[in-house]
């Protein structure tokens, strides 16, 4: 910990270096496109009319809306040899995406109803209709059965973690097997409805 900065040192074998750099670039892009984007919209979107938990869902949905495009752009701007400073990358090489997010924030209504929130999330789901995610024992997996943990980049202490994880995955359809918390299932069905499929096996 260096003041407000956290520094992580990682070593790997030379033969794994290129793969490691690729993974590091991928995760650095996710930090920016989720955590940094959340901070910007959290400061600029009041979303009056929604509860605290509903507002958090709205912010997650806003992040998810352009997540893949944002991530591709951020990764295209990442250049490093053996060190990468995420804050420096954002502050000096990503001003264009910051301006894009700031412009988007000006178009978001400052008052939302719960029905409008459902409509907005429903629109996102329809746009992602071909993308499948899998839920097993309250964990979310992508189409390659890799565990999704993007919601860990959001502030802790709020409900709807499973629903936010599904939103951040860009899911259009959900396949559930194993056990799932009833209240979490209720929240999922509230937004995804007939896009949820349950395995009885």
Q: Where do the PLM segments sit?
A:
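C-terminal structured domains
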Residues: 144-201
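Conserved mixed alpha/beta catalytic, RNA-binding, or beta-rich assembly cores of soluble enzyme
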Residues: 1-160, 164-166
